[in-house]
Amino acid sequence: MIRVGIIGATGYTGLELVRILTNHPDVKITFLSSRSFAGKKLNDVYPFSLKNETLEEIDPEKISKNCDVVFTALPAGVSYEIARKLKDVRIIDLGADFRFDDPAVYEEWYSKKLPDYDPTERVYGLTELYREKIKNARFVGNPGCYPTSVLLATAPLLKNGSLDEETIIVDSKSGVSGAGKKESIDYSFSELSGSLKAYNVSKHRHVPEMEQEMSKLCGKRLKLVFTPHLVPMVRGILSTIYVKTDLSLDEVYELYREYYGKEKFIHVLQPGVYPSTKWTYGSNHAFISMAKDDRTDTLILISVIDNLVKGASGQAVQNMNVMFSLAEDAGLSFNPIYP
């Protein structure tokens, strides 16, 4: 059995890790940590949880002794500091600390420094793109939720060199759980119910992450226009991406079918079939569709994921499975909750 620790177990992504790993056939949870609830049992904090383990303070020596892999679900800068103290343990960070090739970009967007950061020691954890590198990685930077939805939708065209990198417009809509558990009037029921709003327009922290990975896929430095929105639902992301390509709609469809044909979690829909976030609720699945606006010669890509599963904790477990040579869908072969 793989001994697993979760640091930050009482946030939304931490709880989702507990939910998934509790039912994983090859895992034993040996350490749970929470800064806010240290000393309490998890099911005292959340009575619906089936785990009665005590939430502990972070103890690097104890974690190193009792864990083979640790998931960190912590604020920017904190995961990196803790990870450096852990010995002979593999790390999957659900924050941003291990996502960037250039620490200066991270510092610019997150206003944090990562002392002695070595980008060659970590792997960006979008499983479908980097599984071969993930296999032997010690540090994996789990992708952000928006980047996951956008990169999955654009990777085949970018890698094929069939996308005009000069014009990429991304419109994404997310459930409010993507903002985490922090208290804010902006995320209250009275502000969100029956409403839709854009936020962090042109300055969302996921922009440099998307640009980094998209540039690597196409081999050219590119920039995109990204506008995220909050919608009055708990889970789910729907991204609509507008791009230019010389390929016909049928050619794009065949390219995507071939690219993702062997993937267990990525589903390419026929043109004219458009996905709903409800199709992914509580699951690690992603659906991608496409349309062509012949009048403006624009290709429209649409992707949906559950932001807490494929966009966070589910993908983290998928990465763990790859790192430990398990079946990639181990612990993740559950269907979406519908309706």
Swiss-Prot record:
Q: Which UniProt keywords apply?
A: Amino-acid biosynthesis, Arginine biosynthesis, Cytoplasm, NADP, Oxidoreductase
Q: InterPro entries, from UniProt?
A: AGPR_type-1, NAD(P)-bd_dom_sf, NAGSA_dehydrogenase, Semialdehyde_DH_NAD-bd
GO terms under biological process = L-arginine biosynthetic process
What residue ranges carry the coiled-coil annotation?
A: none
Pfam entry (one): Semialdhyde_dh
GO molecular-function term, one example from the UniProt record: NADP+ binding
Residues at the active site: 145
Query: Which transformation does this protein catalyse, written as a reaction?
Result: N-acetyl-L-glutamate 5-semialdehyde + phosphate + NADP(+) = N-acetyl-L-glutamyl 5-phosphate + NADPH + H(+)
Query: Could you name the domain of life of the organism this protein comes from?
Result: Bacteria
Q: Name one GO cellular component term.
A: cytoplasm
Compartments where located: Cytoplasm
Q: What pathway annotation does it carry?
A: Amino-acid biosynthesis; L-arginine biosynthesis; N(2)-acetyl-L-ornithine from L-glutamate: step 3/4
Where mainly located?
cytoplasm
Q: What is its EC number?
A: 1.2.1.38
Family assignment from sequence similarity? Belongs to the NAGSA dehydrogenase family. Type 1 subfamily.
Q: What does this protein do?
A: Catalyzes the NADPH-dependent reduction of N-acetyl-5-glutamyl phosphate to yield N-acetyl-L-glutamate 5-semialdehyde.
Under NCBIfam families, the record lists: argC
Question: What is the protein name for this chain?
Answer: N-acetyl-gamma-glutamyl-phosphate reductase
Which organism is this entry from? Kosmotoga olearia (strain ATCC BAA-1733 / DSM 21960 / TBF 19.5.1)
